[in-house]
Design a protein with these regions (language model features):
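Extended alpha-helical targeting/anchoring segments
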Residues: 1-333
Length: 333
């Protein structure tokens, strides 16, 4: 049976874990060393926010009183023609060397007073993503339908599961571009984990797995490692952020191109969202994610660009990733 949380009260929910009764908020990753339960959110740009909660229970997402859905037209930070130009500029940079893949994103926004807890409750019913999560405290509210694992940690064992490759149905086949993209990011994540793991412990136990998700199929791989003794959460996050799947390869070059060519900061989109409890953790990549800033609700969508990308097809992929969730939350894309 669903519990009921006071409207507007700080809370966190992910995978049947409900956290309530906020104790403190921190912007310093060293707070995670105290061994307590923290819900965390980082932005793509690296801003860290964490909330410590007193009461942790295993239960369904709390019941939400029905309110108005989002209505109206969502506006994109980048038009179709502008996005196509962005993709072509990335392809030019790939042709000149120095970068192999860049994740090209855009933000869609709408002015709305609708609450994201109702949006999240509807997402859980109609789009039950494996890493769906909800976080609300102080001025932050996030409702995520993420399909992608940023990391799990169990003592000294760590795993990341990057997604590269998206198609509409399980009957279609992933193309060479999808497989090449995924392998590039697997190599990148092996390198990132190598900064914090025992030499020789990095493994790829599952490569190019076809996963079905609500309305979509994704190509997923697992990369694992054994953490070095004494490694801190601050060191882990520094080594791995931002996620390779939403930046590109090489990561440093892709980040420079994104900063140069994308018209708005990504913010919550493409950061991470989840929980840390001592040496245990589940963190998702904050894709398929809604978040509130003042009077506006935002949603991000993007596609991985390689030399073989077709710019118009990449735009259509960003539409595909957005359309199902927008139909659930409300408004017109």
């Amino acid at each position: 049976m669903n519990s009921v949380t006071k409207a507007g009260a700080p809370q966190f929910w992910m995978g049947g874990v409900l956290a309530r009764d906020l104790i403190e908020v921190s912007s310093d990753p060293s707070c995670l060393a105290d061994g307590d339960f923290w819900a965390i959110s980082t932005t793509y740009e690296g801003e860290f926010r964490a909330a410590k909660f007193k009461t942790i229970t295993n239960e369904a997402f709390p019941a939400v009183s029905p309110t108005a859905r989002v209505s109206g037209k969502w506006e994109s930070s980048t038009s179709e023609s502008e996005y196509i130009q962005y993709v072509e500029k990335i392809r030019e940079k790939i042709a000149s060397g120095g970068v192999y893949q860049v994740n090209a994103c855009r933000r869609i926004s709408i002015k709305s007073s609708a609450t994201l807890d109702l949006a999240f409750a509807n997402i859980l019913k109609s789009n039950p993503a494996p890493f769906a999560s909800y976080l609300r405290f102080t001025d932050m509210e996030i409702a995520s339908a993420s399909p992608e694992l940023f990391l799990t940690r169990d003592c000294d064992q760590i795993k990341t599961s990057p997604i590269k490759g998206t198609k509409r149905s399980s009957s279609e086949k992933f193309g060479n571009k999808d497989r090449a993209e995924n392998i590039m990011i697997v190599d990148l994540m092996r390198n990132d984990l190598g900064q914090i793991c025992i030499p020789g412990s990095i493994a790829v136990p599952d490569l190019l797995r076809d996963e079905d998700h609500p309305g979509l199929s994704h190509l997923v791989s697992d990369v694992t490692g054994t953490l070095r003794s004494g490694i801190t959460w601050a060191e882990i996050l520094t080594a791995l952020l931002p996620a390779g799947s939403i930046s590109g390869a090489p990561k440093s070059a892709a980040k420079r191109i994104i900063a140069e060519l994308e018209p708005t900061a990504r913010g919550t989109y493409c950061g991470v969202l989840g929980w840390v409890h001592g040496d245990q953790a589940v963190l998702s990549v904050a894709i398929r994610t809604f978040w509130r800033e003042s009077e506006f609700i935002h949603f991000g969508t993007g596609a991985g660009i390689t030399w073989s990308s077709d710019a118009r097809a990449e735009w259509e992929e960003t539409q595909l990733k957005a359309e199902r969730l927008i139909s659930i939350v409300g408004g017109q894309l």
